[in-house]
Amino acid sequence: MPRRGPVAKRDVLPDPIYNSKLVTRLINKIMIDGKKSKAQKILYTAFDIIRERTGKDPMEVFEQALKNVMPVLEVRARRVGGANYQVPVEVRPDRRVSLGLRWLVQYSRLRGEKTMEERLANEIMDAANNTGAAVKKREDTHKMAEANKAFAHYRW
């Protein structure tokens, strides 16, 4: 924790096409080595694929996917008397969004399709339908929290 008080939270600018801060945050998560224009191209192409395959607005599909991926509970390690306990805690709203975006990109990269655009589009569509690896990650996180419910009184 810094000695000079809390660090100011940086605000991201909405993206030029969809005018959404969420889309900008997703672009930043996709970006590797500062290549933002490449990340934008990947996301916008993925959105075009989603529009083509579903016939729906890609923003609606993306928002539904994010809603299905964001965790409500997670476990955090807490040391009590020489033992480490996995204590279930609620996830802060900003962290929920961050984890959701991170998992969408992370599990898109692990998919088998040829291009990143296809992988991302398919992962977003799967997540919107409550399937896919990112949704499974959320379910696993919730299961861990449920399994460690007995240690909930160690919350801080």
Curated annotation (Swiss-Prot):
* Annotated GO MF terms: rRNA binding; structural constituent of ribosome; tRNA binding
Q: Which domain of life is it from?
A: Bacteria
Instruction: Tell me if Lipid metabolism is a UniProt keyword of this record.
Output: no
- Cystine pairs annotated here are none
Q: Which UniProt keywords apply?
A: Ribonucleoprotein, Ribosomal protein, RNA-binding, rRNA-binding, tRNA-binding
Q: Which Gene3D superfamilies match?
A: Ribosomal protein S7 domain
Query: What's one GO-annotated cellular component?
Result: small ribosomal subunit
Give GO BP annotations, semicolon-separated.
translation
Matching InterPro entries: Ribosomal_uS7, Ribosomal_uS7_bac/org-type, Ribosomal_uS7_CS, Ribosomal_uS7_dom, Ribosomal_uS7_dom_sf
Keyword set includes Lipid biosynthesis:
no
Q: Which CDD domains match?
A: uS7_Bacteria
Please name the HAMAP family in this protein's record: Ribosomal_uS7_B
**What is this protein's function per UniProt?**
One of the primary rRNA binding proteins, it binds directly to 16S rRNA where it nucleates assembly of the head domain of the 30S subunit. Is located at the subunit interface close to the decoding center, probably blocks exit of the E-site tRNA.
State whether it acts alone or in a complex, and with which partners, per the record. Answer: Part of the 30S ribosomal subunit. Contacts proteins S9 and S11.
Q: Which family does it belong to?
A: Belongs to the universal ribosomal protein uS7 family.
Protein name per UniProt: Small ribosomal subunit protein uS7
Q: Which organism is it from?
A: Geobacillus thermodenitrificans (strain NG80-2)
Q: Which gene encodes it?
A: rpsG
